[in-house]
Amino acid sequence: MKKIMLLVAVVLAIASCKSKKKELATSIKSHDEKLAEMFPTAKIDVKTVGVLLYDGYSTLDAMGPYNVLGELMGTNVFFVGLHKGLVADVKGMKVQVDTSIAEVKHLDILVIPGGFKETYELTKDTTLLNWIKMIDSSSVFTTSVCTGAWILGATGVLNGKEATTHWWGKKILADDFGAKVQQKRYVRSGKYWTSAGITAGMDMGLALINEIRGENYTRAIMLDLEYDPQPIYKGGSDYNTDTAIVNAMRSMYDMGMEKVLHPVTSYQNIKFDNAKDFFCGMPLNTGVADTVHYNGKVYGFCSKGCKDGFMKDPASYGGRY
């Protein structure tokens, strides 16, 4: 009798194990199905994302979208340089770039980051502009962050289209490249996506992911990145920041871009009566952007802003430099 009871117990145990295995298999299948429902396959096929790097680019303009778009499973996100090797951002941080524009013939998404003087100078680089046009001819999306819109605009593709850029650079984008500038965090005009300054590139990156993979996938990425910005103050753009602060920053940008936007070569043979800019102290051998005649003498200045500062009280600078 005991042998019979033991045999029955063994049979029941085996049956129980088989039942649990079946339940587990069913559970796993159900879990996979739920994941498939929650994160459906991509609506748009994106296999390659190239982030352009050049000396003087703004760090977060490139690294923000690089990190965000790097969350696209099955997508190769990489840097593309004007040349291979080390590329320095605007603050001198160097990044090794293993792929040059000469080697890349197609990208599903191109990201063009912004910067400052170097970015504007690249709007005249025909080699780069022709490469962007070639990539754009077959890309799914062609995008820019911050003043990278200047470079994209220089190809002609933003002429007559809605776009945005860094708040200070909007006038250049409109006047030089014909864009219909919008006061938005990011703007989509067909296949072209442009973002406002620096941090806005991450928002644009999330919007691109939403377009490619949908809401649930985007929310999962936001959770993975713990993307929940909470700045200490409201502000960050020219329309929601104190006017005095905006004007001070605008003046700084104006001075910094003076030589690039208004290059003057006719001053090279002029003998100046000052060796340094009276207002800021910068040596004139680095370049002269403006001049003034005062008390029979000719003074040079590194920017119009410095000249204007001098002219408010020129007598106070007597004997300086």
Question: Where do the protein language model's features map onto the residues?
Answer:
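Sec-dependent N-terminal signal peptides
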Residues: 4-12
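Extended, subdomain-level signal for the structured scaffold at the beginning of enzyme domains
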Residues: 13, 17-142, 150-154, 170-171, ...
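Conserved Rossmann-fold dehydrogenase catalytic segment
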Residues: 183-196, 226-227, 233
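Residues immediately within or flanking Cys/His clusters that coordinate Zn2+
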Residues: 274, 289, 296
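Short cysteine-rich clusters marking metal-coordination/redox-active sites
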Residues: 277-280
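Short metal-binding segments enriched for Cys and/or His
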Residues: 304-321
